[in-house]
From Swiss-Prot:
This is 3-isopropylmalate dehydratase small subunit. Its EC number is 4.2.1.33. It holds the Pfam family Aconitase_C. The gene is leuD. It is an enzyme of class 4 (lyase). The lineage of its organism: Bacteria, Bacillati, Bacillota, Bacilli, Bacillales.
Amino acid sequence: MEPIQVHKGKAVVLDRVNIDTDQIIPKQFLKRVERTGFGQYLFYDWRFQADGADNPAFELNQPEANGASILITGHNFGCGSSREHAPWALYDYGFRVIIAPSFADIFYNNCVKNGLLPIRLSPEETELWMERAKESQEEITVDLGEQLIKQNGLETKFEMDSYWKQMLYNGWDEISLTLQYEEAIAKYEHRQSAVNK
């Protein structure tokens, strides 16, 4: 996984609540197990019309959303069924940070495990950053080490579990984290095999 220490990027606002994983990536696109190639299906039913043409009213289809890597959205983002394809699609599309007042628990964990930084802010702070992103195309800086979001004088502190922070900051998934203890694991296995003889 790519580490996230300081991320600078343009933000796009998707001011909706209870966006579920089927809206993030519809079930008909879940037939593969590779993590790549899902970005093209992100928010498919909202991004495209029935004939396959872009939906000109959808937020991500607006010119100012092009190249955005920070998504600011509403309460309970990622609710619904547990599908790891949802963070895969967000990541593959180009998002690295998602800011919302709340996330579904399993979705939140899947984000971190797949290199996305989910940030919980209060509803008021989220609204403030939504307004800022709508007003300005200036990049927002997210500093994971300092747990700080900032742009042009506005700063907001955010909380994050130290375990998840360490995973994202170092670019570790669960396998690479386990490999940090490979020597200790080998010693333990050696001791256990000696005891069990």
